[in-house]
């Protein structure tokens, strides 16, 4: 990867001039000028995912200049470096090879001169055997009963991905009841333990190091609860498995290391659902469906690695997002899935994007003087329409939105799905084209009102429009399609980080709070007044001490 400040490139200067000349562009005019705009500004991936980016504030010239920026910042070398196993996570000295985890070809992928695929495939085979035993009921608990409940204990990448994917693939789930515990707040584990029977429960402890504070606190609580009822520590081996690389700590916990499923330093937490961290996904929907998830991601990987920038879905989405972030000054992007099964999809990519590209230091170690990662948020439609769409439509902030929806529902009840999709189609049309003063007045006249009667109300019913959106329509939410969609967003994030000249695969921003929490924790175990911090922190701690007494 080359360390190029994007703002110093000729393409960036050209984009600034282009923006200055075209910032008053109206989507209404762009569509009026070109009846074939949809054909020019949409792509189909794999025959079952349509990406319509025509409702964006872009022209063919805009895209040409954005592609020039990708070329001038040498995006190609960054893509090649990732797929070739180069140590592009330089602050931690690691390769970034989540693409290896879903490599469904015979192509070797090397890290430090060694092909990682034999180890990847060995872990997948081990996962498959384990899943088959649990799902079939062959695996028995300490009283001879089959497993009915699976509790995944993890946090961050060891939780958000498995939660999102198991929820999204709920139509494919088997009889196993899945539970997820992440928060160190005792309420999370306590409420989960109320729902399960130790005789029929399998706990998955997901921590690469087996030292993560939140995860190990919850795991120890679960183990203590289990032993108290089961009565023998030896039974832990039949009810706990580890997704980890720390064999010594796993064994000391009481887990049989034969039931430890490893992954590697070149797997980042927020990109780890394709690895052993995906065990709860495989247990929930079966290993064949987990493999279909990998296949979908692999096909998107191949598209990303080989397609021209002009026909490359992740690259185009990244460049369009950069256009709003760095030239229009948009601070956030909304991800709005019109599918209730995808209700955790925005939260998953909130982590994926903000932990990856929430950086203010470039790859040269210098503070940047341009905007990097956006704020990511969203909720499923149509719920969001009755919550925050008001601000998107008529507020003062520009919020580019991605709308996602399946053409075919897993639950075709009555006219529910046509009504859902009517809203999906209507929202991007409304955001793009709005409603003019003249249209509002015409509606009032048609309803029998006079303009004099409604003149004070008219301004409030005007929609400016010109709000940009992408529409991502897919045939059905299958494991394969979901895998492709996740990989699409992963690569979008990578492209933006590469162009912004930042490191997208570390997360030093999570460390300071943890360090301070470790310092504060012993102070909470005494009754003495705390004076070692600033007056605000001291005041908060001392008030807590007084109140808990």
Swiss-Prot record:
Question: What metabolic or biological pathway is this protein involved in?
Answer: Carbohydrate biosynthesis; gluconeogenesis; Carbohydrate degradation; glycolysis; D-glyceraldehyde 3-phosphate and glycerone phosphate from D-glucose: step 2/4
What would you give as a GO molecular function for this chain, any one? glucose-6-phosphate isomerase activity
Quote the protein name from its UniProt record.
Glucose-6-phosphate isomerase
Is Cytoplasm given among the entry's keywords? yes
EC number(s) recorded for this UniProt protein: 5.3.1.9
Concerning its family, UniProt says: Belongs to the GPI family.
GO BP: any one term: glycolytic process
Reading the lineage from the top rank, the first entry is Bacteria
Instruction: Quote the HAMAP family the UniProt record gives.
Output: G6P_isomerase
Q: What is its main location?
A: cytoplasm
Which is a Pfam family this sequence falls into? PGI
Lineage, top ranks: Bacteria, Pseudomonadati, Pseudomonadota, Gammaproteobacteria, Aeromonadales
Localization, per the record, is:
Cytoplasm
Per the record, the gene is pgi
């Amino acid at each position: 990867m080359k360390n190029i400040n994007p703002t110093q490139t000729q393409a960036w200067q050209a984009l600034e001039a282009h923006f200055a000349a075209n910032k008053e562009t109206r989507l209404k005019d762009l569509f009026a000028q070109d009846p074939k705009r949809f054909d020019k500004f949409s792509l189909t991936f794999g025959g079952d995912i349509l990406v319509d980016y025509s409702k964006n504030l872009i022209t063919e010239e805009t895209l040409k200049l954005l592609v020039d920026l990708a070329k001038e910042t040498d995006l190609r070398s960054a893509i090649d470096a990732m797929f070739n196993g180069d140590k592009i996570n330089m602050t931690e000295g690691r390769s970034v090879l989540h693409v290896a985890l879903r490599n469904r070809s015979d192509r070797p992928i090397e890290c430090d001169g060694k092909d990682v695929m034999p180890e990847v495939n060995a872990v997948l085979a081990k996962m498959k055997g384990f899943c088959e035993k649990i799902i079939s009921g062959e695996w028995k608990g300490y009283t001879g009963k089959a497993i009915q409940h699976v509790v995944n204990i993890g946090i961050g990448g060891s939780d958000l991905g498995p939660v999102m994917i198991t929820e999204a693939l709920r139509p494919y789930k088997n009889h196993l009841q899945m539970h997820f515990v992440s928060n160190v707040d005792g309420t999370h584990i306590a409420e989960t333990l109320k729902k399960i029977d130790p005789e029929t429960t399998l706990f998955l402890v997901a921590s690469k190091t087996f030292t993560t504070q939140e995860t190990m606190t919850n795991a120890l609580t679960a183990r203590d609860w289990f032993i108290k009822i089961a009565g023998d520590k030896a039974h832990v081996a039949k009810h706990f498995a580890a997704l980890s690389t720390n064999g010594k700590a796993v064994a000391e916990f009481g887990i049989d290391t034969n039931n430890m499923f490893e992954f590697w330093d070149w797997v980042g937490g927020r990109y780890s659902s394709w690895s052993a961290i995906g065990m709860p996904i495989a247990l929930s929907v079966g290993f064949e469906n987990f493999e279909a998830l990998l296949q979908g991601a692999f096909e998107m990987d191949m598209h990303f690695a080989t397609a021209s920038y002009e026909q490359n879905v992740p690259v185009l989405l990244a460049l369009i997002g950069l256009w709003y972030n760095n030239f229009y000054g948009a601070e956030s992007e909304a991800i709005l899935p019109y599918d209730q099964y995808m209700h955790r999809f925005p939260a998953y990519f909130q982590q994926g994007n903000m932990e990856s590209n929430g950086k203010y230091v470039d790859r040269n170690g210098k503070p940047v003087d341009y905007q990097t990662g956006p704020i990511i948020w969203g909720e499923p439609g149509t719920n969001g329409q009755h919550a925050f769409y008001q601000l998107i439509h008529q507020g003062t902030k520009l919020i580019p939105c991605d709308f996602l929806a399946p053409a075919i529902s897993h639950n075709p009840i009555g006219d529910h799905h046509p009504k859902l999709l009517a809203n999906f189609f209507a929202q991007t049309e409304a955001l793009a084209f709005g409603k003019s003063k003249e249209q509002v007045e015409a509606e009032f006249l048609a309803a029998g009102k006079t303009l004099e009667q409604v003149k004070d109300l008219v301004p409030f019913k005007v929609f400016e429009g010109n709000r940009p959106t992408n529409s991502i329509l897919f045939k059905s939410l299958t494991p394969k399609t979901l895998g492709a969609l996740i990989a699409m967003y992963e690569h979008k994030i990578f492209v933006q980080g590469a162009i912004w000249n930042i490191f997208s695969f570390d997360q030093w921003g999570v460390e300071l709070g943890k360090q301070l929490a470790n310092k504060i924790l012993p102070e909470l175990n005494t009754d003495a007044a705390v004076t070692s911090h600033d007056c605000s922190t001291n005041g908060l701690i001392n008030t807590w001490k007084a109140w808990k007494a």
